[in-house]
UniProtKB/Swiss-Prot annotation:
UniProt superkingdom: Bacteria
EC number: 5.2.1.8
Source species: Zymomonas mobilis subsp. mobilis (strain ATCC 31821 / ZM4 / CP4)
Domain comment quoted from the record: Consists of 3 domains; the N-terminus binds the ribosome, the middle domain has PPIase activity, while the C-terminus has intrinsic chaperone activity on its own.
Record keywords, A-Z: Cell cycle, Cell division, Chaperone, Cytoplasm, Isomerase, Rotamase
Lineage: Bacteria, Pseudomonadati, Pseudomonadota, Alphaproteobacteria, Sphingomonadales
Name of the featured protein: Trigger factor
One GO-annotated biological process of the protein: cell division
Primary localisation category: cytoplasm
Catalytic activity: [protein]-peptidylproline (omega=180) = [protein]-peptidylproline (omega=0)
């Protein structure tokens, strides 16, 4: 095998690789020898079909397999011999006009992972915004919890339904005067004001009494889940069989005991623990964002353009999806186009920051243990139906890239913990409102403060895509954390 370097510029590497016909022939002979024992033909004992006959029957497909393997092995040997670490899968192009029996010449193109420069962490300064879970906050949370545990009592016969009441109805839905599939039901409970039904349904039941019949006129939303009902006007013939009023929950020892606890004090302790966990999560989110901002400002090394392009494409697809659900999707898309360069800069920042975090983790011997990985797999499997969980686990164990994506957030959090230990941290007591406002202020700042490595937020918590006259720019969608640097095929 011969290799010739044709480009060495920055992170870009191009090679011409020649694999001799003799090497390919040896690989074909090996493929035939390995396939022969598995071939069964009438007149031959199992596994005793002559290699020449196997070659005659399956030679073309075996030759193609052998060529592909020879090319892949050649590329791997090239990378090993040159000590190159590609950032993504190399591009391989076989010279046009190749014929079996001749030398194979291929062009190999890739970008290498950059060397991440050493920086000092002595200047890392962070402010930890802390919120106390005081008695007032605990009482308010318990009150909210009690309201969600509410039960209903029978009302007087002449009671008119109000918001908050539970109305039990039988109904027949009609479109163009004809009942439609799924539009008929009985003994359905409707909590007025809960907003669980199509617009207008609950509102038109306000004032209804037990035994009363009404015709409710509604319009199905344009985004309704049933296609043939989208945007359709409909009427529901409704009969109210019962109206029940909410029972006010009293927060006391009896309420706590109804939840299986010993006392109200135990409920308060549990609620305090949950609130503190939530507040600590918000505090960490703010600190992590500030930390990543400082790290991003500290690094300026070149990053692989392929990784940036892949990251940008991922951002852009998510933005296009969000824009397609705007009232004026064309205006939202046009606004996105104006900011294309900014989103590309965000993609570059993400890649650089991901590589830096991976490098810091590697130099500090950060690892995700097998027990931790098993726990991550188990947690991820819970999102699937019980019948599908084992298949998911088996698939994950066979797919290194999927496993890397699952491992990445925990790996990154371990790196962040190390950096927290190295940083100079000062504490400042704030209210929850002030902490959330500080996080939102970070969220609203697009370029510099794009917090792509924060896993604590859901996509639904992000601002909606920008409309034509909106004053605020849409933040780039979140991505998964960067894995260790040795995962070459992706920055994920």
């Amino acid at each position: 095998m011969e290799t010739v370097e044709t480009l060495n510029e920055g992170l870009k590497r191009n090679y011409t690789l020649t694999i001799t016909a003799d090497e390919i022939r040896k690989r074909i002979d090996q493929e035939v020898a390995e396939a022969a024992p598995r071939v069964n033909l009438p007149g031959f004992r199992p596994g005793k079909v002559p290699a020449k006959l196997v070659n005659k029957m399956y030679g073309a497909s075996l030759a193609q397999d052998a060529l592909n393997k020879a090319l892949q092995d050649g590329v791997q040997k090239l990378l090993s011999d040159k000590g190159e670490k590609p950032a993504m899968q190399p591009e391989i192009e076989l010279t046009e006009g190749y014929e079996l029996g001749k030398d194979a010449e291929l062009k190999v193109k890739f970008e290498i992972l950059p060397e991440v420069p050493e920086i000092s962490f002595d200047d890392l300064k962070l402010e930890r915004l802390t919120v106390e879970a005081d008695n007032a906050v605990i009482d308010e949370k318990i009150k909210e919890f009690a309201e969600h545990q509410k039960s209903f009592d029978d009302s007087k016969k002449d009671h008119k339904a109000e918001n908050g009441d539970l109305v039990v109805v039988d109904f027949v839905g009609k479109v163009d005067g004809e009942p439609f599939e799924g539009g008929t039901g009985s003994d359905m409970s409707v909590e007025l004001g809960a907003g669980q039904f199509i617009p207008g349904f609950e509102e038109q039941l306000v004032g209804a009494k037990q035994g009363e019949s009404r015709v409710l006129k509604v319009t199905f939303p344009e985004d309704y889940s049933v296609p043939y009902l989208k945007g359709k006007d409909a009427e529901f013939d409704v009969t109210v069989s019962d109206v029940r009023v909410p029972r006010k929950a009293e927060v006391n020892d009896d309420f706590a005991k109804s939840l299986g606890l010993e006392s109200l004090d135990q409920l308060r302790d549990l609620m305090k623990g949950q609130i503190e966990q939530e507040l600590n999560g918000l505090t960490r989110t703010y600190m992590k964002r500030k930390l990543l901002d400082q790290l991003a400002d500290s690094y300026s090394f070149e990053v692989p353009s392929q990784m940036v392009e892949a990251e940008f494409n991922q951002i852009w697809r998510q933005l296009e999806h969000a824009a397609s659900h705007e009232e004026d999707s064309e205006a939202a898309l046009a606004e996105m186009e104006k900011e294309r360069d900014e989103y590309r800069a965000i993609a570059e920042r993400r890649v650089r920051l991901g590589l830096a975090l991976s490098d810091i983790g590697a130099k500090n011997n950060v690892e995700v243990s097998q027990n931790e990985m098993n726990m991550l797999i188990s947690q991820a499997a819970q999102r699937y139906n019980p019948a599908d969980r084992q298949r998911f686990v088996e698939y994950l164990r066979q797919d290194p890239m999927m496993a890397a994506q699952l491992r990445a957030p925990l790996y990154e959090d371990k790196v962040v913990d190390i950096l927290f230990e190295k940083a100079n941290i000062t504490d400042r007591a704030v209210t929850r409102e002030e902490l959330e406002a500080a996080i939102e202020a970070e969220e609203d700042s697009i370029g510099k403060h794009d917090h792509d490595h924060d896993h604590k937020e859901k996509a639904s918590d992000k601002p909606k895509a920008k409309k034509a006259a909106a004053p605020k720019k849409k933040a780039a969608p979140k991505k998964k954390a960067a894995p260790k640097a040795e995962k070459k095929s992706s920055d994920e």
